[in-house]
Amino acid sequence: MEAQVLAQLLGLPQGEQVLKERLGREGHPQLSSALAAYLKRLQAPREVLAALEGLGQGAVVTGQQAGLLGGPALTFYKAHTALGLAEKVGAASLFWVASQDHDVEEVRHLHLLLEEEVCTLSLPLPPLPAGRIPFAPYREAVREFLGSWSRDTRVAYALEGETLSEFFARTLLAFLGERGLIPFDPMAQELAPLFQKALERELEDPLASAQAINQEAERIRALGGRPPLKRKPGATNLFLETDQRRLLFYQDGAFTDGVRRYSKKELLEILRTDPSRLTPAAGLRPVFQDLVLPTAGFVVGPNEFRYVAELSGVYALYGIPMPALFLRLRAVVLEPPIHRIVERYRLDPWAFVDGGEDAFLKAVKEVLEGFRELEAELLRLLEEVEALGQKAHALEPTLERPFRRFRARLKGEGERLLKKLLRARMGRDAVLLHHLERLKRHLLPRGLPQERVYPFAMYALRHPEALLRLREAPISGRATLVLG
């Protein structure tokens, strides 16, 4: 089910009018001072420190896992949408660094397009939250992989990060700090204590939020949707970090992480000693975010939208309004060689992102001499069959359906033959093959949309105007960023 359809069926808050109505909420009393201390430790640009004033009006929040060099480009597109919305209403724009996430497979790879080759760095990260992984053991490998880019002042600053999540936060500050983007790392020593009261409250009734999620999941399922979140009997929405990060279960007045049992008193003591060891699961994280931040708007991707849609009951449980939800910008970057190729074939780059090789074949046939004439002949043949079918129907009405099936088979076989002809022609044409492979490397690397593979920092390092092109882009929908 599409995100927008789901939003309408569930009556989820969306749009700039709702964003304005959500302004003025108060965040945690110590939020501004804690954030200021965190940002000063990271030596954040003055524009970011000045942006803290916007917290008095409210916040537009987005977030992402702490990927290498900022993670895939969609990270910057989320930030751009949040910055644009915040600017419209005079609020602050915050980026939630998902430092509590321990799915290292999502963050241990860095893919770069260098000299027309997809190069990959894969770090052997331990299965720990990103905020617990020291960056020092991997710094030299990243520096060597980046080559001369590691000497860029922005990258050199980011490489000073002490943890994986700090490397990510510093990357955001280095490339988007001048726009006032405020990173927020919930495991940072200055910020983790802000969640203590929320965690204490969750421990008082540890199954209530899980039950609220399951109830909303049933509602979505009844409407024809496929809710991604579901809690097993006894499962809470809390993780406890010991030697690993494990989900807590609750039964008969006690908690267990599958290794040992804990009383509520023991967990409260752990919380008071080190509040970063108790962390919310996906079904609770946005609500905890909004208990601490004065969130008015929340920028998400399509997949995130589906799980946030299940949280209406959890927001009600905590007595706070769900923020206005916005889908992030989608964008594709065209470097000069790729821009020339799409112009040559009059190919819509988004058609290629969506359709891959088939979209290229469709564009190629428009410029191949003789192919359009052959396609026109097929269309004329189909028109003749249509006319023949009408004559047959006049003589014998029962023949209408067989003629319709005959025409459909002829059309399908004709299209398959034309596609085979195109592929055969392309197999003999080195230029066409070269252009197709180049389009794949740039727009569909690893078979995925560009925005999910390459970091936007790569484009910013290669093209000085890249950040300006992003700043000029719309804040929603689809954008094509032409560089060079």
PLM feature spans:
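N-terminal leader/transition segments
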Residues: 1-44, 63
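Long, compositionally biased intrinsically disordered regions
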Residues: 13-20, 175-262, 361, 366-484
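N-terminal catalytic cores of NTP/NDP-binding nucleotidyl/phosphoryl-transfer enzymes
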Residues: 55-89, 300
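Glycine-rich phosphate/pyrophosphate-binding loops
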Residues: 70-73, 86-105, 323-324
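Short acidic, glycine/serine/threonine-rich loops at helix termini
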Residues: 72-74, 103-110, 195-199
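A structural-propensity feature for long, helix-poor, extended segments
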Residues: 107, 111, 119-120, 333-366
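A glycine-rich helix N-cap at a beta->alpha junction
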Residues: 111-137
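A translation/RNA-centric and nucleic-acid-associated enzymatic feature enriched
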Residues: 229-296, 300-313, 322-324, 329-331, ...
